[in-house]
Amino acid sequence: MDPKGYVFIRCPDPGHPNAKSKPGWIAEHVWVMSQVLGRPLRRGESVHHINNIKHDNRAENLELWHTHQPKGARVEDTVRWARWFLAEYGAEFPVTS
């Protein structure tokens, strides 16, 4: 466990793109989420611990977060970003409501 409370594990896949901060190691919550998704995390994605306990890396306690447009963005830029976001994630996370 690191000083911030995150658990690091030996990366089962040494070439995993998310195992770059400590060569050969990966944050366990990142590994778990990448296994749930079936792919590495992409640029701008992060993993949030729902209960805020950083060593509770059960899949059901993790959420995939993505950085969003900054406040004050022009509407046309926000619409362009929203179209990109839906194209990027729409098939993985279909709208259910």
Model-derived features: where do they sit?
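Short intrinsically disordered terminal tails
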Residues: 95-97
